[in-house]
Amino acid sequence: PPAAKAIIVLGSGVINGQPSPTLANRLDRAAPVVLAQPNAKLVLTGGVDFAETESEAAVMSRYLQQRYNIPTAQIILEDQSTSTELNLQNSQALLSAQQISTQQPIVIITSDFHTLRAAAIAKKQGYNQVSMLGATTPLGTRYNAWLREYFAYGSGWLLNEYWLGNSPNQAQRSLAM
């Protein structure tokens, strides 16, 4: 990926205080990118799951620090969100506080099955220079993940989560027809 001002890793579940296999793959995909770009801010996204006491973002941070020695000064925790849309929306304010705008180069790391929908949401929210990187989905969850994402993409289209054209209102007009 090109030199980035920020790298955003989207959450994907925590199990007993540890990253889920899908989330661990995202973090393992992110680590070399982060290490190669020490001046880029790293935003780790995800709030507290109903069955957990610690946010996904905090678990992600601990994993990257322990396994890859990612410096805490590079990490920003977005620990309030519960969806892709909120991950990216909340990250904007945190990046803005660091004088980083959505007009600057940003890398978003998620799972391979999730890149299309995440890119569409990012575009609608004004992220204009995004590079998407997809981590491999663990074989045991791959088919369920792809099926779930298929329906999530359709649902997002109906809920107008994506920017489908040259103007933000075009998506609303196409839904009204």
Identify the role of each PLM range:
Residues P1-L147:
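A structural signal for short, hydrophobic/glycine-enriched beta-strand patches
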Residues F50-E56, A152-L159, L175-A176:
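A general structural signal for short secondary-structure boundary/capping elements
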Residues R142-N166:
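A transmembrane-helix-recognition feature enriched in membrane-embedded lipid enzymes
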Residues L164-M177:
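Short linear elements at protein peripheries
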